[in-house]
Curated annotation (Swiss-Prot):
Chain's gene name: CHI1
Coiled-coil intervals, chain numbering: none
Xref: Gene3D superfamilies: 1.10.890.20, 3.50.70.10
Binding site for substrate: T50, N115, S192
InterPro entries documented for this protein: CFI, Chalcone_isomerase, Chalcone_isomerase_3-sand, Chalcone_isomerase_bundle_sf, Chalcone_isomerase_sf
Protein name: Chalcone--flavanone isomerase 1
GO-annotated biological processes: flavonoid biosynthetic process
EC number: 5.5.1.6
Keyword Isomerase: yes
Gene Ontology MF term list: chalcone isomerase activity
Primary enzyme class: isomerase
Similarity comment text for this entry: Belongs to the chalcone isomerase family.
Record's keyword terms, sorted: Flavonoid biosynthesis, Isomerase
Organism listed in the record: Vitis vinifera (Grape)
Reaction catalysed by this enzyme: a chalcone = a flavanone
């Protein structure tokens, strides 16, 4: 297993996202890729609803660096393809959504479902399998309530399983409440947060800035290794 990249924690409002976590249903430690708020402009005031942290498996850095190292933070932040590569990459992801204002499971699932279905229909990939996955997603959340400080947790397996769990006190359970086997849903939940129409532009900017820095470090480490094995000139 590759070493967890050295990253810092991120404070979003009163929510602290630690530098690394072991998600429910996973055997891996994932590092904090980025974090930010989700909010809406309501009557001229920006109202913050949730704080969102996105964690990535260690292999995300070398995998993404192949295509994206050397790009500026602005180039990454403005690139739809970059965030698609994060969403669809062959590495584990974990999303922690912590409430700032009270939220019901039905409120949350209705909005996420709407965003997922809209995305699938826009790219022509909405089938009966996705409809059933959304139904199960809504079922898992329908009776839940999330006072401020509670969290909805998603472990996104690259094999196509979405593990859903909840936390009332900031701790992470070892196992999930439910697992939905649908690759498109597994990706679409994260797409709804950091994709083209993602609900947290702040989390996207944070991801771009932190990954850009890690790509630079990755390139520097590769250069050092290359110099170690290069023959010494006579």
């Amino acid at each position: 297993m590759s070493q967890v990249p050295s990253v810092t924690a991120v404070q979003v409002e009163n929510v602290l996202f630690p530098p690394s976590v072991k998600p429910p249903g996973s055997t891996n430690d994932l590092f904090l890729g980025g974090a930010g708020v989700r909010g809406l402009e309501i009557q001229g005031k920006f109202v913050k609803f949730t704080a969102i942290g996105v964690y990535l498996e260690n292999s995300a850095v070398p995998t993404l660096a192949v295509k994206w190292k050397g790009k500026t933070v602005e180039e990454l932040a403005d690139s739809v393809d970059f965030f698609r590569d994060v969403v669809t990459g062959p590495f584990e992801k974990f999303t922690k959504v912590t409430t700032i204002l009270p939220l019901t499971g039905r409120q949350y699932s209705d909005k996420v479902s709407e965003n997922c279905v809209a995305f699938w229909k826009s790219v022509g990939i909405y089938t009966d399998a996705e409809a059933k996955a959304i139904e199960k997603f809504n079922e898992v959340l329908k009776d839940e309530t999330f006072p401020p400080g509670n969290s909805i947790l998603f472990t996104h397996s690259p094999l196509g399983a979405l593990t859903m769990s909840f936390s009332k006190d900031g701790s992470l359970p070892e196992v999930g409440n439910a697992v939905i086997e649908n690759k498109l849903l597994t990706e679409a939940v994260l797409e709804s947060i950091i994709g083209k129409h993602g609900v947290s532009p702040e989390a996207k900017k944070s991801l771009a800035a932190r990954l850009s820095e890690l790509f630079c470090k990755e390139a520097g480490d590769e250069k050092i290794e290359a110099e170690k094995v290069a023959p010494v000139a006579c």
